[in-house]
């Protein structure tokens, strides 16, 4: 029989027994009977801290792994986790190369769609890698079609992780400026939100993915990978859909960019030896579409926080990849799809020279200073 998940009421019972000398002498069933009427008389605000504790316990339980011992019998969990992280990164890179190679061999590289995802969060739990989601955005992107569609929503988890209100206020004030729960904007039913998001993302899977039940692969920046992974787990856990928690794989968009660029350069006969992950990472850090108007949600446009809007982020990633790769394939840049609406490009495609942009010498695109 599957073990029951911790819930808010049982978190209250445990706290009551720990703080009440009389309660420590009761069995669990007796304590539950004693606490029932007390719980019924509590307000939603009073119950909030116990809901938060139960939530954190559920998410952390899913993340926990059995500790192993080294030869002297000492826990080597850190080394095990380090090795697992290295293996996961290598597997991710192999998968990205396989995806791009498959599209290239089938002559569909220009049409191959990729999913970009970003999350904003309210706060991070102190005792685990748990981020509480505040905003989600995703978009579909291909080299030929640019950004074909996007999905964006704000999220209201109902309450802040217990004891984290001050940290959440500081984080919001210095980044996305979203109001905190319980006054947060957006979707409150996180289970439905996760199901709707998974459905939207899964629409990009091809027939082979559907046939073999392959996970959905999404891309984000290296800095946001732990945030995106944790926020998806949070939504899946809240919606009681743990069995689908592994349906979404989060990959490095910078490594995708590198793989695409090197592949395209090879296709057009341009040397690609100078390209490496440090080069592609630097372009994403520059983020020269950061101040483009008209690509953020209405709220972040109004409060002047477009840089931190997740919708703006995923669109900017598509624009950056388009800017650095489409010229090599003589793909015309379309406003809203490959570039922001107000940007006008005037470059001429010359296969032998267009890739010089990656060395910082391509200056006929309407931008300067990079």
From Swiss-Prot:
Q: Which family does it belong to?
A: Belongs to the maelstrom family.
**Entry keywords, A to Z:** Cytoplasm, Developmental protein, Differentiation, DNA-binding, Meiosis, Nucleus, Oogenesis, Repressor, RNA-mediated gene silencing, Transcription, Transcription regulation
> Any keyword Transcription regulation?
yes
Taxonomic path: Eukaryota, Metazoa, Ecdysozoa, Arthropoda, Hexapoda
Q: Which PANTHER family match?
A: PROTEIN MAELSTROM HOMOLOG
Physiological role = Involved both in the piRNA and miRNA metabolic processes. As a component of the meiotic nuage, plays a central role during oogenesis by repressing transposable elements and preventing their mobilization, which is essential for the germline integrity. Repression of transposable elements is mediated via the piRNA metabolic process, which mediates the repression of transposable elements during meiosis by forming complexes composed of piRNAs and Piwi proteins and governs the repression of transposons.
Which SUPFAM superfamilies does its entry note? Answer: HMG-box
Would you tell me the protein name for this molecule? Protein maelstrom 2
